[in-house]
């Protein structure tokens, strides 16, 4: 489900990837959390790649619409 949502936000013409932010678990960072704009993400098998950082899907905490603050995905 999460991978499908990210693909939809990246590639569907009704969505603009610049409008979304991914928050993910990053141990050692402030509050153990970092964020990356969706537009900078590349999807690989079971993780996302940002620059040289690999983010496993299980570490994604939220996907947020920056325009209206809507949370599209939140890890339970």
Swiss-Prot record:
Any Pfam family matching the protein: MJ1316
Signal peptide: none
Family to which this protein belongs: Belongs to the UPF0248 family.
Protein name, per record: UPF0248 protein MmarC5_1387
Organism this protein belongs to: Methanococcus maripaludis (strain C5 / ATCC BAA-1333)
């Amino acid at each position: 489900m999460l991978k499908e949502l990210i693909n939809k936000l990246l590639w569907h013409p009704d969505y603009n990837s610049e409008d979304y932010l991914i928050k993910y678990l990053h141990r050692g960072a402030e509050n153990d959390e970092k964020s990356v704009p969706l537009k900078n993400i590349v999807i690989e098998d079971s993780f996302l790649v940002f620059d040289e950082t690999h983010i496993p899907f299980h570490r994604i905490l939220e996907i947020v619409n920056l325009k209206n603050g809507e949370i599209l995905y939140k890890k339970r």
